[in-house]
């Protein structure tokens, strides 16, 4: 399958998996216009929509797309039932779409009902994980988001993280503020800065990359523990995760 990202709003990405014959799967269409334009340009035939959570910038285009393509199947968690979903899915479910298998797992934190879709090598993680960061805790707890990150971290290192926002540069600036001497973070920051200066995308990224530069995956690293312990003594990984999220909220 071919992976395409369609820019939307200020910093969203709507992901599309397309076959050479034009049949495609659309992920989190927050608005319909750019998707419809891409469909016309590429002569796609939409077969399914995957929704990760209920926020409007991820579901806003569903109604118009269903009107245009009445046979399209819309999958999503229970919290998206009133957003145009035709089939509710949840943790442990498996889908076969266009001959490709998708595993679904619950990733609460950003919202309580947030889910991710994994079809090797792609992970569509919505607003759970960003490159270098994690989603805001609008409904869930740091404990829930930490456990969601651990689920993602259990996937193969070559997994391609297809998150829904271009937040990478801001996240790397935050990471540098925490660990300014970290070589991996510095190197990645400069790479991302160059890409964004050229208006190029930083996504998708590999899980291997995130394990190196995403502080929320490194809460048990000695360098980060030492940094945190200079301000407060936090013995538990979840507490350190919560500390990081709080710092990012105020950054």
Swiss-Prot record:
Q: List the disulfide bonds.
A: none
Task: Name the GO terms of the biological process aspect.
Answer: methylglyoxal catabolic process to D-lactate via S-lactoyl-glutathione
| Residues engaged in binding Zn(2+) 1 | 53, 55, 110, 127
Cofactor: binding comment: Binds 2 Zn(2+) ions per subunit.
Q: In which pathway does it act?
A: Secondary metabolite metabolism; methylglyoxal degradation; (R)-lactate from methylglyoxal: step 2/2
Identify the residues that bind Zn(2+) 2: 57-58, 127, 165
Q: Which reaction does it catalyse?
A: an S-(2-hydroxyacyl)glutathione + H2O = a 2-hydroxy carboxylate + glutathione + H(+)
| Any Pfam family matching the protein | Lactamase_B
Record EC number: 3.1.2.6
* InterPro entries xref list: Clx_II_MBL (IPR035680), Glyoxalase_II_hydrolase (IPR050110), HAGH_C (IPR032282), Hydroxyacylglutathione_Hdrlase (IPR017782), Metallo-B-lactamas (IPR001279), RibonucZ/Hydroxyglut_hydro (IPR036866)
Q: What keywords appear on the UniProt entry?
A: Hydrolase, Metal-binding, Zinc
> According to its UniProt record, which cofactors does this protein need?
Zn(2+)
SMART domains, per the entry: Lactamase_B
The Swiss-Prot or TrEMBL record annotates one GO molecular function as:
hydroxyacylglutathione hydrolase activity
Function, as annotated: Thiolesterase that catalyzes the hydrolysis of S-D-lactoyl-glutathione to form glutathione and D-lactic acid.
Assigned protein family: Belongs to the metallo-beta-lactamase superfamily. Glyoxalase II family.
Query: Quaternary structure per UniProt?
Result: Monomer.
Listed NCBIfam families = GSH_gloB (TIGR03413), PRK10241.1 (NF007597)
What is the designated name of this protein? Hydroxyacylglutathione hydrolase
Q: Which organism is it from?
A: Klebsiella pneumoniae subsp. pneumoniae (strain ATCC 700721 / MGH 78578)
Its taxonomic placement starts with: Bacteria, Pseudomonadati, Pseudomonadota, Gammaproteobacteria, Enterobacterales
């Amino acid at each position: 399958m071919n992976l395409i990202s369609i820019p939307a709003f200020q910093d969203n990405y709507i992901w599309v998996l397309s076959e050479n014959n034009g049949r495609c799967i659309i992920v989190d269409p927050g608005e319909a216009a750019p998707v419809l334009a891409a469909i016309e340009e590429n002569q796609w035939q939409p077969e399914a929509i995957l929704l990760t959570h209920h926020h409007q910038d991820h579901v806003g285009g569903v109604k118009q797309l269903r009107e245009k393509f009445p046979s399209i199947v819309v999958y999503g968690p229970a919290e998206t039932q009133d957003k145009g979903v035709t089939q509710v899915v949840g943790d442990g479910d498996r889908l076969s779409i266009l001959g490709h298998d998708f595993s679904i797992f619950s990733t609460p934190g950003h919202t309580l009902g947030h889910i991710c879709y994994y079809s090797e090598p792609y992970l569509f993680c919505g607003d759970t994980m960003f490159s270098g960061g994690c989603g805001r805790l609008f409904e869930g707890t740091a404990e829930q988001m930490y456990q969601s990150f651990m689920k993602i971290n259990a996937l193969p290192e070559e997994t391609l993280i297809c998150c829904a926002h271009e937040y990478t540069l801001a996240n790397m600036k935050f990471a540098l503020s925490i660990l300014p001497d970290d070589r991996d973070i510095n190197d990645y920051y400069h790479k991302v800065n160059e890409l964004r200066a050229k208006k190029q995308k930083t996504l998708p990224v590999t899980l291997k990359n995130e394990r190196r530069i995403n502080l929320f995956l490194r809460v048990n690293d000695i360098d980060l523990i030492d940094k945190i312990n200079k301000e407060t003594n936090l013995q538990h990984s979840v507490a350190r995760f919560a500390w990081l999220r709080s710092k990012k909220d105020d950054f």
